[in-house]
Amino acid sequence: MSNGKQTAHGPQLDVPIRAAVVSSWADRPGDVYLAACRSFLQPGDTLEAVKPSQLADGGFDMVFVTQVCGYSALPAKVAAASLPALCLEPCRGYHPYHAAFYRELRARGGTCLPALLPEDVAASVRAVRSRRALRGMKLLVFEPHGDGVRTAQLNAFGRACRERFGVEIVVRDTDELKARAARFDARAADAELARWYAEVFEGPGEADPAYLQDAARLYLAQREALAETGAVGVSPHDIAGFLTIPQPVTMPNLSYGPLVFDGFLVCEEGDAEMLVTELLLQAGLGARPTMSNIYFAFRDRFSALASYQEYTAEMELADCRQCFEDNRITLAHFSTSGVLPPEMMVEPRFKIRKTLPSWPAQAMIAATPKLGPVVVARLGEQASEIHLEYGEADARATGDQYGWYRGRWFIRLPDARKFAARCFHQHYAVAPDPGDHRCLETLLRDLLRLT
């Protein structure tokens, strides 16, 4: 079985799977049971009826258990094969005959896939498919070398991702990215800019020609590195590698718009944990997320000001109190709403805005986020925990008078206090919520064993 595909358009999750089917009553399940199993598979998938003793060496992704009633030898053999399992009757609904099998499989540390109703089985199979697709995927992080603490964190996180998910974090130096970009001439940059204006941006916006050429070169450099590594997402450390060096240079942030339009996962600040979170959310939801800073501030007191410079500590405390009172958090990043994928944008294209007031020489993509139900999440630094919340983006606030926070949006949560008590970091991923969480929850909780 091949690993998850990697294309020029980001994660490819619709990969074939191999499923086994076993019976506790016969060497081969009856045709009616096989038909029930096949009804949940796609063309290209493999379904093979095997003896329980053959499970461990068959290269299977999951097992359908049929014709089981009460206690049997099956749980021990399925657990030994380390395969996620579900029980299936011809009616494709839950039967109490399955209870003893599930109970013993759990006791042996095995994985029981949800299968109460046909829609639960379908979601479980989708989760297994996404789990298979994740194996072998790569994500690219550009980080300035020299920070020993962060290097150690990235190495530990990368090992955990390989072991738990089969996902590889490829870490390169930001100096390499800049050197790659320098190899592209003005002609190549201008050709790329022409495509951007035709497909991605409304126009050059607030950036000057030289800055735009630099941004195009950085885009071409990232595309080159993505192609070489086979990575499906990228996160350059745009601050430490470009902005806060002795002589600041053009940040790669404008390039993120074309990259997400291409289909890649993208996040800022070399945040590997965030990039993997985005990948997991896309695998479980089928929708691409964005990333943003979250705040318990910048609410009504801030919105009433004529200038961000008038914001006092007392006002910020009042806004913090408001967040806990009405269970909302504020999102903003680089003076915009973040790197929104096209499906999360109100407009068909990005604008180019200067990152005022903090970095007047830099520019960032800007778009208006769509409102509606969302999933908010972040993976822990050991890749063993995930903070996952369901909420609703229900308001926006824009205006140049708000400076660094001129592109705010607000998410209503079930309980802001509980969110703060578990909060992992200032960066969180936000994805559109399709309303059905079964595949996501099965992938994260049952298959990847994230707590």
Whereabouts are the PLM-identified features?
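N-terminal basic/disordered segments at the start of proteins
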Residues: 2-46
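Cofactor- and metal-binding active-site motifs of prokaryotic enzymes
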Residues: 10, 39-46, 50-135, 146-156, ...
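Structural motif
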Residues: 18-30, 65-69, 89-91, 142-146, ...
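Well-ordered, non-membrane alpha-helical segments in soluble/globular domains
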Residues: 29-40, 98, 154-155, 215-219, ...
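Metal-dependent C-N hydrolase catalytic cores
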Residues: 39-46, 51-62, 198-219, 423
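Conserved, well-structured core segments that form the ligand-binding/active-site neighborhood
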Residues: 103-287
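Long, charge-rich C-terminal accessory regions
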Residues: 266-391
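Extended hydrophobic packing segments that form well-structured cores
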Residues: 339-451
